[in-house]
């Protein structure tokens, strides 16, 4: 942009005050300000338009590269599918030529799980044993003595 310092602006303002006069100077400054604002907006719009067109060109190039990559991938998939179908046809033709063996695997033998269903049905539930005071765990003699020994009073 134009390099105008404060001293140059003061000199231009002084000359404009002498030439135009103090009555018309504020109106002239206002018009110059609006014209400069319009010029800046116009330049910014032109820059934006140029940037947009450049971005569109880049996007078109990217689109073309992606489309070519998709075409290449599609072609490779088609060729691999054709190769696979050819190999499959060859393999099935060879398998059809070989005699068929009468091999039938024996089914697995049934093994009973050995669950003690009747014992479980006849068993008394633990919650009932706890309520009735039935002992479910055996204590050793030493453990029983230690459990029922009276506490020492200090």
UniProtKB/Swiss-Prot annotation:
GO terms for biological process: protein transport by the Tat complex. GO terms for molecular function: protein transmembrane transporter activity. Its main location: membrane. It comes from the Bacteria. It holds the Pfam family TatA_B_E. It is found in: Cell inner membrane. Signal peptide: none annotated. The chain crosses the membrane at residues 1-21. It is a single-pass membrane protein. One of its GO terms (cellular component) is TAT protein transport complex. InterPro entries: TatA/B/E, TatB. Keywords: Cell inner membrane, Cell membrane, Membrane, Protein transport, Translocation, Transmembrane, Transmembrane helix, Transport. Part of the twin-arginine translocation (Tat) system that transports large folded proteins containing a characteristic twin-arginine motif in their signal peptide across membranes. Together with TatC, TatB is part of a receptor directly interacting with Tat signal peptides. TatB may form an oligomeric binding site that transiently accommodates folded Tat precursor proteins before their translocation. Belongs to the TatB family. The Tat system comprises two distinct complexes: a TatABC complex, containing multiple copies of TatA, TatB and TatC subunits, and a separate TatA complex, containing only TatA subunits. Substrates initially bind to the TatABC complex, which probably triggers association of the separate TatA complex to form the active translocon. This is Sec-independent protein translocase protein TatB. The gene is tatB.
